[in-house]
């Protein structure tokens, strides 16, 4: 089961980078992972992306291994959903970074879209992308302290106004709703109740300047 690797690889043409598959490691391959990181730091690779083993479980060794290296920047855990356990680190004295993405498919997708992709834009010297707005078609309630990235369906009315409908099945392991979606709805922190008709920030699931209507 390596759907996350295939998904990221499928985006390589859209995001202007060459993808090299580093393979799959087992739960007990902590030492192998450490050796791979060291090898990648010494190579021409600019960005290391992992998927899984970043939470707080017994076999989630990625944070512990990454912290063994000399780092100039490190964070783990953000008040978002999906993707809360995401990890980022920059290695000292080399222009290389690592993103540790959560293992659930939707978490991987959201974190790539909202963390890895903006980083790529930055190193390419491209201006930060701005969301477009759409009217909410259904009420939504969430935790006030958390930013939510929601699988949604974008449509347009007869007079050309954009509308967004939040889909059922927002759990990070549910693929069907992700396949049925064509946009990410970003529901900001500091607010719990989002009412029908409210304008919501929207992002294409695979980057800007692409046709997101199906």
Please tell me what each predicted stretch does.
Residues 4, 8, 32-37, 41, ...:
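General structural feature for long, well-ordered alpha-helical segments within catalytic domains
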Residues 30-31, 56, 109, 194:
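Loop/helix-junction capping segments adjacent to catalytic residues or to phosphate/diphosphate-binding pockets
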